[in-house]
Amino acid sequence: MPLVYFDASAFVKLLTTETGSSLASALWDGCDAALSSRLAYPEVRAALAAAARNHDLTESELADAERDWEDFWAATRPVELTATVEQHAGHLARAHALRGADAVHLASALAVGDPGLVVAVWDRRLHTGAHAAGCRVAPAQLDP
């Protein structure tokens, strides 16, 4: 399988059991390499903490997810936030109506420069923007 770029929403699917978790796991298990912006690290930690605050995860489940996250992150090739990625993200934010973090993820994925790259994303805006920018996205479509 090709390289797969995981945004924070895709990583959360790996760490919790929810719709899309099976596909995220298959992408992780089958890819030649997993990549993501360094921005994903704090985003995922924040998402896990929010899930615990909302009582979607118990303290024990949170501890397990945080431990698993460290393992996933250690196996991920980080894409650095260079000046080029920064500037491209600014343009992508406007072109695709993206939030700042989503624009950074899309610019980071595009910076990889691999035409076979798959972008694993469950965030609706980023999914739409990545598709419009010509990326292969997984899942192919998001449920309405």
From Swiss-Prot:
Keyword hit for Hydrolase = yes
Give the induction annotation.
Answer: Induced in persister cells in response to D-cycloserine.
Family annotation (InterPro entries): PIN-like_dom_sf (IPR029060), PIN_dom (IPR002716), VapC_family (IPR022907)
Q: Where does Mg(2+) bind?
A: D7, D102
| Key word Thylakoid present | no
TM segment ranges: none
Q: What is its EC number?
A: 3.1.-.-
Single GO MF annotation: magnesium ion binding
Cofactor section = Mg(2+)
The record describes the protein's role as: Toxic component of a type II toxin-antitoxin (TA) system. An RNase. Its cognate antitoxin is VapB49.
Q: What is this protein called?
A: Ribonuclease VapC49
Its source organism is Mycobacterium tuberculosis (strain ATCC 25618 / H37Rv)
